[in-house]
């Protein structure tokens, strides 16, 4: 099953994502609390997929996405964000996001998106 890095500044969101992903059989190999830490963990771990929140301190999700995709164009990144951030989602896709999911989401919806991205 795919290895996944969760990048989100909310401890609650990370816990929920981890629970859903592990219950679906994915291996959560790491977590990060901001975009810079997410980039650093990506370089260290090279997971199959990154789930990336958009609004975070230090380096937001869009900037972290640009940084990861700039150096690792084949990286698979799924943006996870609050509903109502359509402009940010368009910006994320324009900068290489493979997919996105809006909170709140169902576990089956997330699984379908991860499976699609992993191929």
Residue ranges and their predicted role:
Residues 11-30:
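Two-component/phosphorelay signaling modules centered on CheY-like receiver
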Residues 15, 63, 84-99, 112:
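Alpha4 helix (beta4-alpha4-beta5 surface) of REC/receiver domains from two-component response regulators
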Residues 34-37, 60-63:
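Acidic catalytic/metal-coordinating carboxylates
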Residues 43-45, 67-75, 95:
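Conserved phosphotransfer cores of two-component systems
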Residues 45-51:
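Active-site beta3 strand of CheY-like receiver
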Residues 56:
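Receiver (REC) domain active-site loop signature in two-component systems and cognate sites
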Residues 105-114:
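C-terminal output helix
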